[in-house]
Regions:
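Secondary-structure capping and boundary motifs in well-ordered enzyme cores
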Residues: 9-12, 39-42, 82, 111, ...
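Inter-helical turn/loop segments and adjacent helix faces that build the functional surface
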Residues: 26-34, 73, 93-105, 182-189, ...
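Glycine- and acidic
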Residues: 100-105, 150-158, 182-189, 250-255, ...
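An N-terminal structural lobe/cap that precedes and organizes the functional/catalytic core
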Residues: 119, 147, 167, 181-191, ...
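Active-site recognition of the HExxH zinc-binding catalytic motif
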Residues: 166-179, 200-204
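A conserved active-site cap/scaffold subdomain adjacent to cofactor or substrate pockets
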Residues: 191-278
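Single conserved hydrophobic/aromatic residue that forms the stacking wall/gate
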Residues: 291-301
């Protein structure tokens, strides 16, 4: 599979994905998709070339050819069946929940240093081994590494400490999966996660099933009072409702347990259309406008 992709294409992908990331960081900060579009379009075309090289002499679609790097032996028609089943129920549930009165929200000023200290304590509480990793800051949270060097990142907003806390918990879920692979398998073909789906299940379990549980919310509420003082919420029951509230949002990594799934459903469909040639990169803004998704200018933290 790897040998089917020409060396010059591999080099071009490495070059242009790196360039695209740096441009994306600037475009994201300024809410300027047109700034990012040329690099995005270039990477998209290169990915199509990669898919075509991989799928030679097979019946795979472009999307399915690339999907094998993330979900081995899974094809998009299987994913379609799952998502098509989930979508109506999720949309209906979303409408019901958003129709309810809003819950009390956390309010205040949350210094970055305090958030960072709390994130470190939360990570350690979940079992993250700092002797084999560290937490840094990035525009987009991620986990990287394996074995004895598994690092994670988070990001901070002085107006929204939940973003950093739950990004940290999510990435700790990824990190724990990697840190708990048997040491004898380090640097071998089986010394890594089985698939991205399994990997994401570990991060989402930590973030939602544990991180948004009532028991954990009681502990976290006390920590919030210790680190930040007045947070606009006076009891752990209200705090529990706040960390589980459902509301519209444009950022997948900061979305609630319900909206997150809808982010994935939308991105999956758009991604398939882009890779398989049914949608051009410069049509994305128009398509999103048709479904009333238009992100406002980002506030300065």
């Amino acid at each position: 599979r790897a040998l089917s992709v020409p060396t010059d294409l591999i080099g071009a992908l490495a070059k242009h994905t790196t360039l695209a990331h740096s441009v994306w960081v600037d475009a994201r900060k300024n809410n300027d998709f047109q700034r990012f579009l040329p690099q995005f379009s270039k990477v998209l075309e290169l990915r199509k070339e990669e898919a075509d090289a991989i799928r030679q002499d097979t019946d795979l679609s472009r999307y399915d050819a690339l999907l094998q790097d993330y979900e081995p032996d899974i094809k998009s028609d299987y994913i379609d069946t799952i998502f098509d089943t989930l979508r109506p129920a999720l949309v209906d549930l979303r409408a019901q929940v958003l129709d309810r009165p809003p819950v009390q929200e956390i309010n205040g000023h949350f210094p970055v240093d305090n958030q960072r200290a709390l994130c470190n304590e939360v990570a350690a509480t979940f079992g993250y081994d700092f002797s084999r990793g560290r937490i840094d800051t990035a525009v987009h949270p991620f986990c990287s590494g394996s074995g004895n060097d598994v690092r994670i990142t988070t990001r901070f907003d002085v107006n929204d400490p939940l973003g950093s806390i739950y990004s940290t918990i999510h990435e700790v879920g990824h990190a724990l999966y990697e840190q708990n692979i048997e040491k004898e398998y380090n640097f071998s073909s089986i010394g890594r996660g089985v698939s991205m789906g399994v990997h994401e299940s570990q991060s989402r379990i930590m973030e939602n099933q544990l991180g948004r549980s009532e028991a954990f919310s009681e502990w976290l509420f006390k920590k919030f009072l210790d680190y930040f003082g007045d947070i606009g919420i006076e009891d752990s029951a209200s705090f529990y409702k706040s960390i589980n509230s459902v509301k519209n949002g444009f950022i997948r990594t900061e979305s609630d347990e319900l909206q997150y799934n809808l982010h994935i459903l939308l991105r999956y469909r758009l991604e398939k259309w882009l890779i398989d040639g049914h949608l051009n990169a410069d049509d994305l803004e128009y398509v999103l406008s048709l479904i009333h998704i238009s992100e406002p200018t980002r506030p300065t933290p």
